[in-house]
């Protein structure tokens, strides 16, 4: 009987120990996700994307043709201008310098990003020269017979299109050749302006031309191989300072 009691007591003791509460395993706490968060738990947050900058657009028109001015009468595909942006109208552009804009027959296309970040002045010249660093000193050589155009406009972030009225900086010299009473064949093999200053710079802000006296005087060939006929006079145009 005692043996049974001992066995029963031992069994109860084991039962009491085995019926103790199980150890609680802590549940994982889900991460707090705020509204608008797109990153998965454990991932690094993405850098916010910068808003796309407003780009400068160009429209251009030509000043009415004058008898004594240059000879570009309309823009054609392939015409290319240089554009400067200045936010304080100082001697040097505070923003974009000498950006290229190429005309495709309909619109002017920028060769690079040209952001408009504040109210600004736009200064342009044509034809484009990648060596130009200052819009107040655009070089020219009469040997190239380029009609130098210049123009300015104002833009803002709300109105980022520069409406440029391009003006002629150079002078057009027009010569009419006639045979009249000349008894010879009437062949003009060469036409040259001699003893003239041939180079200088143009201020694209004002159109002022500065002659290069250090370069000296030279000759400018403007054509040749003309057969004179009074019924149809030969007209020769030359770009001069």
Q: What positions do the PLM features span?
A:
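Sec-dependent bacterial lipoprotein signal peptides
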Residues: 1-17
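Sec-type signal peptide cleavage vicinity
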Residues: 18-241
């Amino acid at each position: 009987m005692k043996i049974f009691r001992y066995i029963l007591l031992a069994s109860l003791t084991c039962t009491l120990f085995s019926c103790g509460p199980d150890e609680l395993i802590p549940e994982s706490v889900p991460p707090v996700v705020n509204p608008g968060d797109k990153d998965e738990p454990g991932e690094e947050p993405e850098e916010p994307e910068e808003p796309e900058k407003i780009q400068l657009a160009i429209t251009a028109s030509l000043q009415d043709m004058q008898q004594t001015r240059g000879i570009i009468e309309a823009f054609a595909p392939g015409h290319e201008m240089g554009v400067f942006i200045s936010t304080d109208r100082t001697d040097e552009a505070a923003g974009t310098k000498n950006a290229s804009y190429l005309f495709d027959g309909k619109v002017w296309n920028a060769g690079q990003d040209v952001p408009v970040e504040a109210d600004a002045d736009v200064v342009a010249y044509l034809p484009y020269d990648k060596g130009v660093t200052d819009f107040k000193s655009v070089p020219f050589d009469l040997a190239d017979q380029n009609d130098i155009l210049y123009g300015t406009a104002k833009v803002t972030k709300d109105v980022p299109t520069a409406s440029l009225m391009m003006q002629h900086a150079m002078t057009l010299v027009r010569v009419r050749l006639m045979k009249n009473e000349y008894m010879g064949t009437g062949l003009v093999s060469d036409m040259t302006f001699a003893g003239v200053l041939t180079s200088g710079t143009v201020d694209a802000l004002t159109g002022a031309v500065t002659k290069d006296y250090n370069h000296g005087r030279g000759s400018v060939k403007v054509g040749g191989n003309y057969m004179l006929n009074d019924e149809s006079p030969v007209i020769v145009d030359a770009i001069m300072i």
